[in-house]
Curated annotation (Swiss-Prot):
One of its GO terms (molecular function) is DNA binding. It comes from the Eukaryota. Keywords: DNA-binding, Nucleus, Transcription, Transcription regulation. Residues 1-71 bind DNA. It is found in: Nucleus. One of its GO terms (cellular component) is nucleus. The lineage of its organism: Eukaryota, Viridiplantae, Streptophyta, Embryophyta, Tracheophyta. It comes from Arabidopsis thaliana. InterPro entries: At2g31720-like, DNA-bd_pseudobarrel_sf. This is B3 domain-containing protein At2g31862. Its main location: nucleus.
Length: 174
């Protein structure tokens, strides 16, 4: 069963609304990006061969998504520099291989926009983002959410803590 929903994606001082579909399964749910991914690619100057990890978290009843580059963008080769620019009729294409996203034919980014890279550490490399979540873990998360709501920390303070606790001072949140 597919259920449509949307989330807010904050990218370099821009707020995009992404359309997602949730596929309910027996013990877990899978979220699939339904549209507006091309806008994310073009606004961030993602290039072919660049490895990116996709993170998401919930806060204040909203779903947030962050793109974290795993390695610096490869230096362009002479063949790429001499290749003709892509035409508007060929939009960016995204393919999925394991837990890494490879981006092809990204448009050039405006000069005013900046993306600051996040350096990967050992904790990120061993994390399997595609691992299934057991029902026991899901119940634990629900109880943690209930405990958080009954704590003395306000939602605003907790949201600020979430933003400050993201790894690396050069990270960006969507």
């Amino acid at each position: 069963m597919w259920v449509n929903l949307s989330c807010m994606c904050h990218i370099v001082d821009k707020l995009l609304e992404l359309n997602l579909r949730r596929w309910n399964m027996r013990s877990t749910s899978i979220y699939v990006l339904a549209s507006r991914w091309k806008k994310v690619v073009s606004d961030n100057t993602l290039i072919e061969g660049q490895r990116i990890r996709l993170w998401s978290f919930h806060s204040l009843a909203k779903l947030y998504i962050a793109l974290v580059p795993l390695d610096p963008a490869p230096a362009p080769t002479l063949a790429i520099l001499l290749a003709p620019a892509p035409t508007p009729s060929s939009p960016p294409v995204v393919t999925r291989d394991s837990d890494e996203l490879y981006i092809s034919h990204a448009d050039a980014q405006e000069e005013g926009d900046r993306i600051l890279p996040v350096h990967a550490d050992n904790d990120w490399e061993c994390l399997n983002l595609l691992a299934k979540v057991s029902e026991e873990t899901t119940c634990l998360e629900v109880s943690q959410e209930a405990n958080r709501r009954s704590s003395l920390v306000s939602d605003t303070e907790l949201d600020l803590e979430l933003r400050l606790s993201l790894p690396g001072k050069n990270s960006y949140v969507m």
